[in-house]
Amino acid sequence: MSSKFNFSLRRKEKREFRNIAHGLIPAATIAPRPAVPRTPPPRSPNPSPERPRSALAAAILSSSLTGRTVAIPSPRQRSYSESDCSRADSQADFEPYATALYTRDRWPGSVTGRPPVPSPGRTDEDDDEDDEGNDIDELEGLEGDEDHVYQSLERQSRADDINVVYAVPLKHKKSEIDSDVDEETEDSAFDIVSPLQTEEETVVPEGAGQTQPSSLPQPRSVSRRSMASPELDDWSSPRSLKTSKRKSSRTNKESPVRVNERDRSSEDSEVLRSTLEVQHALVKELKEQNQILSQEKETLEKRCLQQSQHMKHLQQELCHTHRERGNSTGEGSELSSLRQQAQELVDENDGLKMTVHRLNVELSRYQARFRPLTKDENAQLKGLPVKGPAPPWLLDMKYLSPLLLAYEDHLNAKDKLLKSCEEELQSLRVRAEEVIQENEKLHTQVSKSSTVSNKEWRQLQEQARLVLEENQVLIEQLELQHAKAKEAHSKHAQEVCKVSKKVMLLEAEKQSLEKELEVERKEHRALKTEFQRVRLALEHSLSLAEHQTVTDKLKRQLQDHEKVKTCEVEDLQVRLSALEVERKTLLLDKTNLNTHIKHLETELQLSQQANRKAQRRVSVLKQQVEDSLEKELIAHQYLANIVTLAEKTTHERDQLMLMASTLEKDKQGVLTRIIESTVNLGKLQEKVKVFLLQS
């Protein structure tokens, strides 16, 4: 389509616009050109907070409304952040105000947007083909919803339920098209089959629909019950009977090899369910840890927010101080006032550009939808009065500003709704793809592991339980050993410290005694020299008798000194021998303690390795539990959808039966009337014949 369209506005009466507010008429009627081009939006949708509108803004608005509605050329680029630019680019498509119900077919809750539902009487191969076709159709529909606003008129034929006051399209065939579309959507509501259902129908044996709900474990935790839908228990028994009948009719026709495979798959499913019960305690622990971590995360986020607020407060104080310093000088105040005025003008200009752009967008969508006017209709159109002054609702800001602001608020709300819906659709698509991939992986795993027997599965379960119990016992033993090792290590350290202190004291005493011995030896040598010198002197000076008496005295003194010294030396030797013995014993104790510590360290390393292996096994089991929980939730959702569809089909069947009964009654009444009329005609003919014969 071209970028310009002729402006189309149909009028049947002169008072057609009596129910429309005056402020909305210029956006649709005052354009002198027949088309309005699409223009890029301004850079910033929220340039500044609200300020009182100036006379310049009123003049620009009045000129833009009374003149041409061609978009104003974009000014020089201002310094905007990346977020503002991306936000402005994302708001290029606006939802129209006058045709707000026109985009209702894009709403995710409508009939066309819902996924079709499987019809009851179809085979598995047809269901798989329908799944692939429906996936392709949904992808094409989603891509089509993201197209540009300029669309063909045939694409817009789905939304003919709109009763626009001032815009009536010419296409009268839209009601028929809408009815056909509704019939197609109602028929297509029975065309999709969930992957879980199709695969379960090829795997479940006879009577599995009746035995499967009873095999499920009754005691569940509160968290699992909250995740499952509460309505499953009410309709589980009749649904299982119906599904068992359907599946039994199918499985009777199949080969015995398929029956054996289904038996194996059912046994595998029972084993998996029993493993879920064993691993549920681990899931609880993980959830508690996740809650603790989430609480810590919230506290950290609160701290970050408080710090950011504190930083903002400091920045505001700095700006305030800078402004106070700038306002102190006269030139700075003039410059700041001029800058404020310039900023106000720029912000008002941006706001006016945004309003003009939105009005142009709405007008272009309107022109893209409706036909152009003929020459006669264009001649009859009069947006402004030919004679007299302009009406006040066209130029006075008191009338226009509230209407335009309300119009902008309405458009912003619509834009937010569109964005939220698109994000939800994208997230749902991603989740659906992940679920499909997980289902495929699970089915491949089940097909690979179908060769395992029930005994082996039970043995594996018992081994897993024993391993878990052993892990718990080992963990407790490790904790006890850690505590004992810490206590022993602390005791040994204290004893070693005491012994080392004693050794140091003994070594100090030994050194002091050795020093005393050396001093005494020196004194002994000095005494010997003096004795010899005195003896020589006495020999020359003293007589023999005197000398003998003196020598006897000296000998006695020497003997006494020697006895004392020998006693002291013996005591010191005894002490030294005792100290050496104690030192040897302490060294032996120290070596024994070191060997014991090394042995304990090796045991700790081995226990840590075993603990790591156990933790890895526990993490693998936790992941398996989470996968099984997600699969169970998906299965519950699919079952809920199937039950709702079954209820809808039963309701429609009852309605059709009532219609058929009423039609049969009407038919019988008509037949009785026809018979009575024929009888009356026969009687009248006989009477006529009788009258003819009489005449």
From Swiss-Prot:
Q: What is its main location?
A: cytoplasm
Record key words, sorted: Cilium biogenesis/degradation, Coiled coil, Cytoplasm, Cytoskeleton, Mitochondrion
Task: Kindly list the biological process annotations in GO that this record carries.
Answer: chemical synaptic transmission; cilium assembly; mitochondrion organization
Function description: Required for ciliogenesis. Also plays a role in mitochondrial metabolism where it may modulate complex IV activity.
InterPro entries per the UniProt record, alphabetical: CEP89
Biased composition, Polar residues: where in the chain? 209-226
Q: Which cysteines are joined by disulfide bonds?
A: none
Alphabetical GO CC annotations of the entry are:
centriole; centrosome; ciliary transition fiber; cytosol; mitochondrial intermembrane space; spindle pole; synapse
Basic and acidic residues biased stretches: 251-271
Q: Where is the composition biased (Pro residues)?
A: 34-49
Ranges of biased composition (kind: Acidic residues): 124-146, 178-189
Organism for this UniProt entry: Danio rerio (Zebrafish)
Where does this polypeptide localize?
Answer: Cytoplasm, Cytosol; Cytoplasm, Cytoskeleton, Microtubule organizing center, Centrosome; Cytoplasm, Cytoskeleton, Spindle pole; Cytoplasm, Cytoskeleton, Microtubule organizing center, Centrosome, Centriole
Coiled-coil segments on the chain, per record: 276-368, 406-632
Q: Source gene?
A: cep89
PANTHER family, per this entry? CENTROSOMAL PROTEIN OF 89 KDA
Name of this protein: Centrosomal protein of 89 kDa
Query: Region (Disordered) spans which residues?
Result: 24-54, 66-147, 167-272
